[in-house]
């Protein structure tokens, strides 16, 4: 419907005044002068990138990754850092838990010499460091490990046993309001790792909750629930974990999809195993008995040998990765079924007052 001439002039004057006062680009029509595609960074897992719908985690947004202990939360974020650094991006790790292992990070492909790291004393200090790094415009990815370890200054200076009801939730709420706009302007990805707690007295539904109040749940564009669902063994020796990640919330694509992959101890996500599995599923790799073939050429007998072939031939692995991404992210293939609506409800109506 056309706007009459007087209204158009009034609107143009208002837009001009806004841009003069707040800067060019402070207001615009949704379809003009901006890319509708969201820039993303790979998670290090092909199946998770596809489940996210956009090929990775979105830049300029807040992401929350939560799960039980030893489920792979820190490993996943270190893989994100490694992927970002390979693209020449600058990354920072806010180690509130004081538990980052640089040797393990290096094994996962992280360039520890160029990784900014901080071990803050208080939650307020950690969040102020995040804000300062964001406002610099020079940092592309920031990891906070973890929300549960962001202890308010008043709690640290008080005595054990003192009641500090709602302090952490209030601190996180203030930080989210301040950080959200700065992250968008700087195009910085901020990932919060979070822990799980149990709500007392829940008779029906999921008793699990995450720490830090409700603000993070609202401000996060993506929320990932990561779980260890089994062990990978070589004989009697456990060498890794079977891992499932559910996309509980997604503002950039359809939510409630899930991905399964292997995390190998000392190596990280088994990307070559994912390439083999997805390649066979989508008929890019042929399987005859125990033999796997790609482009008519045998690449290995058994999955382990085929993974070794891809590891020794990164060009072949990169070609297969590109074909799978083009096929599955364009919608010509399907990765995994969405969880049911009932699962989605169970999978985190989370609140927290710790």
From Swiss-Prot:
Pfam families: RecA, RecA_C
UniProt key word DNA-binding: yes
Example GO biological process: DNA recombination
Keyword line: ATP-binding, Cytoplasm, DNA damage, DNA recombination, DNA repair, DNA-binding, Nucleotide-binding, SOS response
SMART domains in the cross-refs: AAA
Location(s), subcellular: Cytoplasm
GO molecular function per UniProt: ATP binding; ATP hydrolysis activity; ATP-dependent DNA damage sensor activity; damaged DNA binding; single-stranded DNA binding
Main subcellular location of this protein, as a coarse class: cytoplasm
GO CC terms in record: cytosol
Residues that coordinate or bind ATP: 67-74
Domain of life: Bacteria
Family designation: Belongs to the RecA family.
NCBIfam families, per database record: tigrfam_recA
Purpose of the protein: Can catalyze the hydrolysis of ATP in the presence of single-stranded DNA, the ATP-dependent uptake of single-stranded DNA by duplex DNA, and the ATP-dependent hybridization of homologous single-stranded DNAs. It interacts with LexA causing its activation and leading to its autocatalytic cleavage.
Protein name, entry field: Protein RecA
Organism: Enterobacter agglomerans
Upper taxonomic lineage: Bacteria, Pseudomonadati, Pseudomonadota, Gammaproteobacteria, Enterobacterales
């Amino acid at each position: 419907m056309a706007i009459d001439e007087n209204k158009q002039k009034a609107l143009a004057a208002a837009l001009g005044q806004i841009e003069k006062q707040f800067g060019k680009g402070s207001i615009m029509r949704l379809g003009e002068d901006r890319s509708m595609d969201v820039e993303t960074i790979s998670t290090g897992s092909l199946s998770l990138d596809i489940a996210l719908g956009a090929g990775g985690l979105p830049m300029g947004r807040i992401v929350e990754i939560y799960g039980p202990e030893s489920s792979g939360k820190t490993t996943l974020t270190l893989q994100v850092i490694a992927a970002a650094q390979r693209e020449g991006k600058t990354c920072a790790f806010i180690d509130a838990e004081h538990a980052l292992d640089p040797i393990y990070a290096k094994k996962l492909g992280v360039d520890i010499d160029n990784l900014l790291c901080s071990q803050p004393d208080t939650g307020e200090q950690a969040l102020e460091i995040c804000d300062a790094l964001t406002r610099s415009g020079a940092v592309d990815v920031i990891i906070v490990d973890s929300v549960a370890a962001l202890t308010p200054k008043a709690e640290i200076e008080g005595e054990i046993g003192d009641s500090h009801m709602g302090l952490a939730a209030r601190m996180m709420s203030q930080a989210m309001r301040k950080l959200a706009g700065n992250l968008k302007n700087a195009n910085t990805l901020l990932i919060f790792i979070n822990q799980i707690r149990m709500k007392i007295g829940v008779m029906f539904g999921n008793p699990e909750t995450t720490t830090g109040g409700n603000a993070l749940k609202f401000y996060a564009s993506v929320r990932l629930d990561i779980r260890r669902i089994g062990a990978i063994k070589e004989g009697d020796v456990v060498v890794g974990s079977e891992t499932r990640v559910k996309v509980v919330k997604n503002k950039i694509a359809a939510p409630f999809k899930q991905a399964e992959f292997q995390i190998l101890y000392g190596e990280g996500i088994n990307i070559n195993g994912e390439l083999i599995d997805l390649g066979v599923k989508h008929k890019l790799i042929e399987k005859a008995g125990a033999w796997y073939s790609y482009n008519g050429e045998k690449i290995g007998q058994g999955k382990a040998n085929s993974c070794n072939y891809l590891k020794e031939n990164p060009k072949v692995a990169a070609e297969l990765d590109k074909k799978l991404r083009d096929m599955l992210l364009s919608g010509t293939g399907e990765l995994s079924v969405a969880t049911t609506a009932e699962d989605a409800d169970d999978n985190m109506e989370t609140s927290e007052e710790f």
